[in-house]
Amino acid sequence: MAASPGSGSANPRKFSEKIALHTQRQAEETRAFEQLMTDLTLSRVQFQKLQQLRLTQYHGGSLPNVSQLRSSASEFQPSFHQADNVRGTRHHGLVERPSRNRFHPLHRRSGDKPGRQFDGSAFGANYSSQPLDESWPRQQPPWKDEKHPGFRLTSALNRTNSDSALHTSALSTKPQDPYGGGGQSAWPAPYMGFCDGENNGHGEVASFPGPLKEENLLNVPKPLPKQLWETKEIQSLSGRPRSCDVGGGNAFPHNGQNLGLSPFLGTLNTGGSLPDLTNLHYSTPLPASLDTTDHHFGSMSVGNSVNNIPAAMTHLGIRSSSGLQSSRSNPSIQATLNKTVLSSSLNNHPQTSVPNASALHPSLRLFSLSNPSLSTTNLSGPSRRRQPPVSPLTLSPGPEAHQGFSRQLSSTSPLAPYPTSQMVSSDRSQLSFLPTEAQAQVSPPPPYPAPQELTQPLLQQPRAPEAPAQQPQAASSLPQSDFQLLPAQGSSLTNFFPDVGFDQQSMRPGPAFPQQVPLVQQGSRELQDSFHLRPSPYSNCGSLPNTILPEDSSTSLFKDLNSALAGLPEVSLNVDTPFPLEEELQIEPLSLDGLNMLSDSSMGLLDPSVEETFRADRL
């Protein structure tokens, strides 16, 4: 009996049975554990899918993929929860639905009361039901009661925490309910049904239509056509263009002038991140087009070379200039520019309603007649003798010049490539269409005469009569027949300036003033009460400065001009309206020190507010 336990324990059959029982028990436990882990994994994956639906559309501030939302809504349905497919096909295609109290009169909640606002976005609307009214109100509080994790899908898609949403709220001009629903819901019946839907216990949201409020739909018919909200979408694009425009479809169609959904209103823009400046109106101090190919804008030195002279031109604003006269400043250019002056007197058309009426027209350039492109033989015309010096050729457009000057003088005329050998010299045939007194006073470039010899004949010239009421374009000291360009002359000028047209009716003689390199422009009401001399950096002006007078807030310009321009023989700005003094403003010539002062690179040309405006668009 004592050996029985040993023999029993040494029985391999019993030992193998124990091993088998242990293995079976371990296999059952392993199977149960695997089943449990499978259930946990499935539930975790399902939860992660729901989390992904709620969070990934605006996670990290990235914009949702809205390029195909409006066109193909059915492509989004298979990737979502099963309840979305049920909701998307249950009432699909129906236009008219019965009221909700037919189905569930006992389940009417406080959500149907007027004043309750529903949260939603473009994503929940595409697979919840067929949209009747294309308006998704945003910026509303979330739902009060949630029953299923998938029930707040559209609520979670309201992008309130991303940086693009902050960009939207910062640039929005109407932060409160941009649809104008009077604080009530702007949802049509299918959206109310989705928001007030009941959970049937299987994760499916049964959507029932709610009562349709006509005042919330802003008198829009129930099947709102696509063309109607597309036209409203085009009308609402009058606001400022945003920097996060998405090309293609519009994710947020809307009612009326909606500026709250601004990041997706850029269907008329280029689709990039740069702002659209075609409808942006602001008062700018820049007179010229932003031509980046010009590399001569920083050079303000006059020097002794006559190569600088042909590039002396000015930008003129058609709507803002009432008289632009020129004066002479530097002895190094007085010989070549002597009596070959170009002054422009334009009609004063005050446009007080346009904020940039004082902006200078970028395509209007006046060239000095000593330009080498006006060569010797093509400028031939009758020359008449008169006792006073020559009156400058004045391009004075009348009221019709708004249409004519847009094609006349272009900013792309090549001026610099002409050689110096074509410069104006003592040869009379170069300026044969000018009176002979002017030709006699045109001196060769190398020996520069003294300023006394040049300014003496100008002091003897009679001044232009002050008759702004009779001739608002600036009165002339010469009859009109003195400076009529013949058609042959106009064609010869056009040969040298292919993109420049000369209006024969608008060529009239103007008041004779000496040539000054920075031409002083006197503008309309925005310009007339305040001036400030600044060089124009964006012109094809070579190394001679263009001085314009943009808007500035100081009314002491006349003192500054009289102190900076000392000793001018005769230049007058005929002002007919807004100056407080009736007397004529006398401007003295600009000396070399004044030119050096104007060429200071530390003088800022851009207003800091304009730069901040462009930076704000790239947030």
From Swiss-Prot:
One of its GO terms (biological process) is positive regulation of transcription by RNA polymerase II. There is a cross-link at residue 232 (Glycyl lysine isopeptide (Lys-Gly) (interchain with G-Cter in SUMO2)). GO terms for molecular function: cAMP response element binding protein binding; transcription coactivator activity. The modification Phosphothreonine is found at residue 160. Residues 1-103 are annotated as: Required for interaction with HTLV-1 TAX. Predominantly expressed in B and T lymphocytes. Highest levels in lung. Also expressed in brain, colon, heart, kidney, ovary, and prostate. Weak expression in liver, pancreas, muscle, small intestine, spleen and stomach. Binding, as a tetramer, through its N-terminal region, with the bZIP domain of CREB1 enhances recruitment of TAF4 to the promoter. 'Arg-314' in the bZIP domain of CREB1 is essential for this interaction. Interacts (when phosphorylated at Ser-162 and Se-273) with 14-3-3 proteins. Interacts with YWHAE. Interacts (when phosphorylated at Ser-391) with phosphatase PP2A catalytic subunit PPP2CA and regulatory subunits PPP2R1A and PPP2R2A. PANTHER family: CREB-REGULATED TRANSCRIPTION COACTIVATOR, CREB-REGULATED TRANSCRIPTION COACTIVATOR 3. Transcriptional coactivator for CREB1 which activates transcription through both consensus and variant cAMP response element (CRE) sites. Acts as a coactivator, in the SIK/TORC signaling pathway, being active when dephosphorylated and acts independently of CREB1 'Ser-133' phosphorylation. Enhances the interaction of CREB1 with TAF4. Regulates the expression of specific CREB-activated genes such as the steroidogenic gene, StAR. Potent coactivator of PPARGC1A and inducer of mitochondrial biogenesis in muscle cells. This is CREB-regulated transcription coactivator 3.
